[in-house]
Amino acid sequence: GPSQDFMRF
């Protein structure tokens, strides 16, 4: 996914 995949919580 994108670089902001860590924002998925």
UniProtKB/Swiss-Prot annotation:
Sites bearing Phenylalanine amide, chain numbering: F9
Resulting phenotype, G1A: In strain: Bangladesh
Keyword field: Amidation, Neuropeptide, Secreted
Cell location: Secreted
Record flagged with keyword Secreted: yes
Ranges in coiled-coil conformation: none
Single GO BP term: neuropeptide signaling pathway
GO CC annotation terms, alphabetical: extracellular region
Lineage: superkingdom: Eukaryota
Tissues expressed in: Detected in the thoracic perisympathetic organs in larvae, and the dorsal ganglionic sheath in adults (at protein level).
Family per record: Belongs to the FARP (FMRFamide related peptide) family.
Name this protein carries in UniProt: FMRFamide-13
Source organism of this protein record: Lucilia cuprina
Upper lineage: Eukaryota, Metazoa, Ecdysozoa, Arthropoda, Hexapoda
